[in-house]
Amino acid sequence: MVTGTIKNKVDKIWTDIWAGGITNPLTVIEQLTYLMFIRSLDEKELATEDFENMAGEKMEHIFPASAAGQSMRWSRFKDKDSREIFLTMQQRVFPAIKKMKYGRLPDFDANGELVEIADDPTRPDEGNTAFARYMDDAMFLIPTPQVLQKIITGLEDLYTHDIADLDMQGDLYEYMLGKLATAGQNGQFRTPKHIRDMMVELVQPTPDDFICDPACGTAGFLVSSAQYLRAHYEDSMTPEQWQHFAGPMFTGFDTDRTMLRISAMNLMLHSITNPEIDYKDSVSKQNSICSKYTVCLANPPFKGTVDAESINDDLKAVTNTKKTELLFLALFLRMLKTGGRCACIVPDGVLFGSSKAHQSIRKELIENHQLRAVISMPSGVFKPYAGVSTAVLVFTKTGAGGTDRVWFYDMKADGFSLDDKRTEVKENDIPDIIARFHNLDAETDRKRTEQSFFVPKEEIAANGYDLSINKYKETEYVPVEYPSTTEILADLHELEMEITKGLAELEEMV
């Protein structure tokens, strides 16, 4: 848990960076991410040295043994003069981590020139983390030695006094990511953690699943899945399942390399060291993945449109459109194995849009697969990022139908106020949603006037496959009795007399 003390220390670091001239929150997080990664390399090196001393067995090291190589270690430069730290970072550490290979940093020659690690065709690049793979175009943007020293001092204080384990590092990074308060150009924005956690609870991943978010952003859904697995299976997972957990279980795609670095770091801080984090336009022809994953969790971009020529033909065959929110639904169905589960967020327009593309994707979900639930969320859920109304769709890929009825739930509260402040409140439907969804047999007799209810497939089909809850929800109107016209007029006359009397009294006083 991130305490108030930790938040204050992070906010202080943030303020120091802003004062130094970096005001874009994404750039701030990116620069902090680099420093956290650099520190983590030294921690791994220290662990390797401890093991060597205990076991007497020689291990491969991250840092070169030369003076230049050892000078790149966090523990060696953190207490130096600010100008020396800045030069070390600028001239050695940063160039070296951009050329990291096989889990090792390159060395420098006598002239201070970087000596790249030679390719070894017999050895795959398994030593590099997903984060290191996306460092080649990274830029060191911290402007001055003084700002860098303040950041390093602040981070070192956090790690020394407040961050006890990997879980705390992950929570700290989540708090930093919470400062990303602006949506991207393609309509992507960060999904609140409690909404992600709810969606993970709905699909209930297992240690043998293959989980994918094809629009991963900061990898929030993958992190929430990892946290769910550790909470429910940590004591029973086999060594093979832990190996699966550390890498191939989790896949994320994005078209923003900065986001790929941030997502890889987020996963690394949650014990997932080698996930499949790839630069990929998921709905384009470059992505041909089919029937590979058992779980998809996503909040795909809403406002984005893509070049019609680049869209994968398989997706256009299901819904012929350029709208990303529709294309991603077709993508989930293609990428899932038969029996795979998906929970995804869609804008309300997907539920009731009347275009052929809108209707065709809804028909595909209902007629050819099993659409299990439509959970309508209030428009304030994504504030302050966006005020768009959204819903969560939960479905299973079958390829053979299976939708006999669809469960609808009208979420009215999510535990936070629905204004820009999003302060914590008592009202919260999420525990109720999870409990009802996992006991749908008890929902059969609910009336349309209640917060959740079933709608048969035939009725949905007859309404153009409309999935908006208001199409089927019934409202009980309580009759209100108003006073008669005679009574209202009598009250008005009485009021007029009181006003006249009051005016007369005022005139006498003048």
Locate each region found by the language model:
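C-terminal, active-site-flanking charged/polar segments
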Residues: 370-371, 383-433
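Hydrophobic alpha-helix feature that most strongly marks membrane-spanning transmembrane helices
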Residues: 268, 301, 337, 341, ...
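Conserved S-adenosyl-L-methionine
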Residues: 188-298, 303-307, 314, 322, ...
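A generic secondary-structure signal for well-formed alpha-helical elements
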Residues: 39-45, 180, 219, 229, ...
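Non-catalytic, mostly N-terminal accessory regions of nucleic-acid modification and defense proteins
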Residues: 1-202, 206-207, 275-287, 376-380, ...
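Short, contiguous acidic/charged loop-to-helix segments that flank catalytic cores in large enzymes
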Residues: 23, 307-324, 348-357, 378-385, ...
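A generic structural signal for well-ordered coil/turn residues at beta-strand boundaries
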Residues: 246, 292, 296, 388-389, ...
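Conserved Class I SAM-dependent methyltransferase catalytic core
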Residues: 28, 255-262, 322-395
